[in-house]
Amino acid sequence: QPLVDLEGNLVENGGTYYLLPHIWALGGGIEAARTGKETCPLTVVQSPFEVSNGEPIRIASQFLSTFIPDGSPYAIGFANPPSCAASPWWTVVETSEGLAVKLLEHKTPEEDDTKFKFQKVSSPNRYVYNLSYCQREDDDLKCDQYIGIRRDAKGYRRLVVTNDNPLELVLVKANSPSQ
């Protein structure tokens, strides 16, 4: 099945969406924050405020398709990234907190290869997904590690690579009646 938003519509390749927790009381949408010694917001976090949609994100598949094909990995980035970021696209980097989802201040060749994949969750709401991180191993792309939340010492809800408690998300089209 192709990727669909909360209203059951196909997710558009290159389209702009909010990523929200499927249970309203578990925080808000996804956004960038300045953490640690960062001088600008490069860390991808979940808003602590349930009423916040976060920032709109863009989902882009390498396939020339108007929608996101089933099972394909894709790039995810902010539609309006901070000006200090070298690219809008998310990447995964090693931090003191483990593997974390971030924006980079300086462009690297590896950043262009970072891919993610939504995996459908068994839920009464048919449109709930986990987000997986995809790693290249030899010629294969393995998408077997989840993206979850880890609170840091200052209370930021950072998106990290984990095998425990994956984040369960819905996609809401930016500027849709559901937002």
From Swiss-Prot:
Entry superkingdom: Eukaryota
Q: Which Pfam families match?
A: Kunitz_legume (PF00197)
Which Cys residues form disulphide pairs? Answer: 40-84, 134-143
Sample GO molecular function, one term: serine-type endopeptidase inhibitor activity
Q: Which residues cross the membrane?
A: none
Positions where Pyrrolidone carboxylic acid occurs in the chain: 1
Q: Mind telling me which Gene3D superfamilies this protein's record contains?
A: 2.80.10.50
SUPFAM superfamilies given for it?
A: STI-like
CDD domains in the cross-refs: beta-trefoil_STI_WCI3-like (cd23362)
* Keyword match Disulfide bond: yes
Q: Residue numbers for the site described as Reactive bond for chymotrypsin? A: 64-65
Key word Acetylation present: no
Ordered alphabetically, the record's keywords are: Disulfide bond, Protease inhibitor, Pyrrolidone carboxylic acid, Serine protease inhibitor
Q: What does this protein do?
A: Inhibition of chymotrypsin.
Looking up PANTHER family in the UniProt record yields: KUNITZ TRYPSIN INHIBITOR 2, TRYPSIN INHIBITOR A
Which family does this protein fall into? Answer: Belongs to the protease inhibitor I3 (leguminous Kunitz-type inhibitor) family.
Stated name of the protein: Chymotrypsin inhibitor ECI
Q: Which organism is it from?
A: Erythrina variegata (Indian coral tree)
